[in-house]
Amino acid sequence: MEQPQAECPAPSKTNSAETVESEKHEALSGPEKHPQDKDGADAAPEKHPQDKDGADAHGEAGKQKSGDQTLPPVQDGGNLECPPPEASSSPPGPACGIPSEVETTEACSRPQQLPQSPRIQQPDLDFYCVKWIPWKGERTPIITQSSNGPCPLLAIMNILFLQWKVKLPPQKEVITSDELLTHLGNCLLSIKPQEKSEGLQLNFQQNVGDAMTVLPKLATGLDVNVRFTGVSDFEYTPECSVFDLLGVPLYHGWLVDPQSPEAVSAVGKLSYNQLVEKIIICKHSSDSNLVTEGLIAEQFLETTAAQLTYHGLCELTATAKEDELSVFFRNNHFSTMTKHKSHLYLLVTDQGFLQEEQVVWESLHNVDGDSCFCDSDFHLSHSLGKSHGAEGGSGSPEKQLQVDQDYLIALSLQQQQQPQGMLGLSDLELAQQLQQEEYQQQQAVQPVRTRAPSSPGRGATSGRPAGERRQRSKTESDCVLL
């Protein structure tokens, strides 16, 4: 049974295929006819094509039919063997080691693609580490993720954990998506309609049914279609029923600036998908006005590719309620968001900060991605810099207090200037003005701060690890970090 494989590399495709077929047939049905091993392989192609199954009496035609039937049984990937004659009489594929044959290449390539499917790779993303944080005086779990996993599920579940609607055992360190979906399903089923009328109850039951249907999608991703008219404006889909039933607000900050009338006219009340279709139609139109409108709409999408505008950030800050927990959608990512003392923060769920107890929230105060890390009480976090920089432990409390005071002064300036600036300035100009004022405030206190530490202390800011997001320049951010 070992010898036929040694003879597979034949000079032609037809002889190679028929050699393997005939020798397999001889090995199982009539070994007494060919006591010689190698010589019999050369004589086999002309003797046995007629008596394989009775259906392939014309050689190549019968071999082609049987070749089509051999692909389904070959599904074991790297441990393939030649199939028995009753299952197939075609070339065995990878086990024969013929890289130049067309049939062999096709038979080998298909099983090798099977391990690449998302279903097989999904278990790698099925387990998530639990991070325990002090939240309003109680030890509370939040779920972290190591890669782009099911962020809608994690964003919603972290809200339920922070609201203490779902609790975990105190020693829980790892959780699966199935467990999270079970907890979420129990929360949905435990919701009772507030209205007792029959019509509203039927509508409520329909919403619950829709939510339970789309529940598995939370583990892979949701299809949401934003509208550029408001931070709460989304095209309604069954996926939105999950947020409605749980009472979790869903926000975005991708808004068109009302002080750009051309962009407002071009975008209108369309959703993202509708706007993309409009751009395609307008660009191929013979009407010059439509072409211009399409170009303006396309420019809006290109200049706001970050999916967060200054106008959207202002509206988001004004719309979100104090201490409200919500889900923020941006760049196809869902984050847990809250508002504390008139400022927005996103929950840090990166597994890289699993052991960083002082890194819980990340500020959201500009569109460029520059941010500050805070602990669970929204105090600026310096734990990352202490372990790597030149900051001494003796002055840490004083430095923390001084930085917090400077930050509060900057926030106070922003709140004082915002009503006046919004009367005649666009959102971008207002943001630049606020940043300039805060920069001047920082320069006023910086000489006092730089004289305190000795020369090695200059390494405090440069000693932050690469994983921490830092300010690109002091004039681009309204958050003061020293």
Curated annotation (Swiss-Prot):
Composition bias type Polar residues, residue spans: 106-119
Molecular functions (GO terms): cysteine-type carboxypeptidase activity; cysteine-type deubiquitinase activity; K48-linked deubiquitinase activity; K48-linked polyubiquitin modification-dependent protein binding
Protein keywords: Hydrolase, Phosphoprotein, Protease, Thiol protease, Ubl conjugation pathway
Compositionally skewed regions (Low complexity) per UniProt: 437-446
Chain intervals for the UniProt region annotation (Ubiquitin-binding domain (UBD)): 402-441
Active site residues per record: C151, H333
Family of this protein: Belongs to the MINDY deubiquitinase family. FAM63 subfamily.
Protein name (Swiss-Prot/TrEMBL): Ubiquitin carboxyl-terminal hydrolase MINDY-1
